[in-house]
Amino acid sequence: MSEYHNPVLLDESVSALISSLSGIYADATFGGGGHTSEILRRLSPEGRVVSFDRDSDAIANRPDDSRLTLIRSDFRWIHNHLIHQGYGDGIDGILADLGVSSHQFDTAERGFSFRYDAPLDMRMNQEAAMTATDIVNGYEMEELEKILRIYGEVDNSRRIAQLICKAREAAPINTTTELGKAIESALPKFAEHKFLAKVYQALRIEVNQEMKSLEKFLSGASKALKPGGKMVIITYHSLEDRMVKNFIKAGNIEGKVEKDFYGNATAPLKAVNRKPILPQEEEIAANTRARSAKLRIAEKI
């Protein structure tokens, strides 16, 4: 499992999650199974875990434990699946690590990384229809500019979109190398990798509809918790962290606090930690992909 993905903030997240050793918990992002395995290790024989992942590669990491139910699904459907599993009355905690797994980054043919010459794929669910190739070759310039600006927070998003559209007029952009060549004139010197990472983030988020999935997940997860149940979420970039922070505060991703007739806030959660928990220096030294992680904890009211 460590070769597939090193779980981030493992002790901090699982300790925050578990309130009862015989409780029922969900790991919404199974990945390499690191968080799930640690939850199972700490639970009593009566405890149960339901884990989710849409990547078939991740499903192969299933530990041999009768207390685990592993479901291949986008986590946006977590509430529906938990009801189907007989947990309609609510569960004790839900954990989600929103990062891309090391396996996905390091498997060249998946197309998640600019470090390899590979097809522009980026699908977390390899049976999904749309790939990054479809986006860079099929989206109008205005659409490309929008996703680069919003999802990647790319400074010169319009220039990048123009270069992509110009390059594909000559020939389709089908590989990571071809994309890099198409936009290389707009890459800032001494910060090429950081800039490319933002471009790839934007494409990946669009391919996998990550923000829409996250919004539906937050809503479903808050409904799936019993009162006092914990929602524990690890974020990696400002866009998703803002969504999680706003949802914990207000019950919606805009962060707009709504009140009932009596003036009471109607948000279903309350924050457990005012400021996010960050990885220790030792963890970052051992796993550089943990450096941007933020852990937020909320409790169902």
Listing of model-derived features with the role each one plays in the protein:
Residues 1-301:
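S-adenosyl-L-methionine-dependent methyltransferase catalytic core, i.e., the SAM/SAH-binding region
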